[in-house]
Amino acid sequence: QLLARFPDSAYAPDARQRMVHMRNMLARNEIHVANYYFRRGAYMAALNRGKYVVEHMQQTPSVADGLAIMGQAYLLLGLDDLAEDSIAVLCENYPDHPNLTSGCEFDSVYTMDGLQRSWINQATLGLFDPPKPPQFNYRPKT
């Protein structure tokens, strides 16, 4: 309301910066929740969180992570055409994203059985070398 009612106020620039920061934090929180849903195996819920970031928070740094979440979730749900579309958009707009290899191939960490586990973890029934769930939030915290 401050910006709408008093656009020429001395506090307006600070209010704009705070609103941008809050929008970035909300988008980052959506990515964090999507990571939680991946760990729980709720791939459709993670997909919806990623899609929300891409559709409604387009000017935030978390859009790349939202696209990666969409690609991963579509792969896990067996929707390969939609996964390819999401990964193509990610590759076109964010070629340096950590989940993309040098040839713009998507580095999928999750499988249909859950996390990819090392042979040590499998041999020790999960006692040693536990899998680290991937985090699609690669942006540094500000």
Which residue stretches match the model-derived regions?
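Short solvent-exposed coil/turn linkers within tandem alpha-helical repeat scaffolds
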Residues: 2-17, 21-25, 55-63, 77-80, ...
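Helix-turn-helix repeat elements of alpha-solenoid scaffolds
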Residues: 4, 8, 38-50
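Amphipathic alpha-helical repeat elements characteristic of tetratricopeptide repeat
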Residues: 24, 28, 44-47, 65
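Terminal, low-structured helical/coil segments at or just beyond the last alpha-helical repeat
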Residues: 29, 33-42, 84-142
